[in-house]
Amino acid sequence: IYPALAIREILARRFTFSSGYVGVSGGMEEKIVSREADIAFMGVRAQGMPRTVSKDWLTFPFRNAAGIYDAFRHLKQFKPDLAVTTGGFVAFPVLAAARILGIPAVIHEQNAAMGVTNRIFAGSAAKVLLTYASAAQEDGKKTAKPDLTP
């Protein structure tokens, strides 16, 4: 949440734009982002991929399919020129909907190892920004170390 808000703050110093934040409805994102008066919060249904065999495997595909629909609807209405994500399971429906709608995506990976969602969408992203070189994918075609220090 905070890396995305920091990226937005840095971009806002250089450009004028409207921004929205897509996060899990009722989740931590909604509580934090709702305090920001100039950011539209758009809720989606999403669920992280279960790491062990459990009943969550039954709901996982359906909740994320619903999340793609939610994100598709929000992005179609908001009409962004760019989708910027910072990973996590909520990025999956956003990146999937952005790909369907032809909206370029920039992925920012702030961890030393790239997460599952970022690995899945790195190949189709317009750019992948890394904090650590160790997070680069083997092909290394779409990665760059960002300089986002204010």
Regions found by a protein language model. Name each.
Residues 20, 83-84, 106, 129:
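Structural detector of well-ordered beta-strand residues that form the stable sheet scaffold
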Residues 1-12:
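Short amphipathic alpha-helix
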Residues 53-82:
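An amphipathic, basic-hydrophobic alpha-helix
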Residues 27-31, 80-101:
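An aromatic- and histidine-rich active-site surface loop
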Residues 12-63, 145-149:
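Conserved nucleotide-sugar phosphate-binding/catalytic loop shared by glycosyltransferases and other
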Residues 39-40, 99-150:
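Active-site-proximal region of nucleotide-activated glycan assembly enzymes
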Residues 2, 88-90, 112-116:
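Residue-level detector of alpha-helix initiation sites
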Residues 11, 15, 78, 101-102, ...:
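Helix C-cap/helix->beta junction micro-motif
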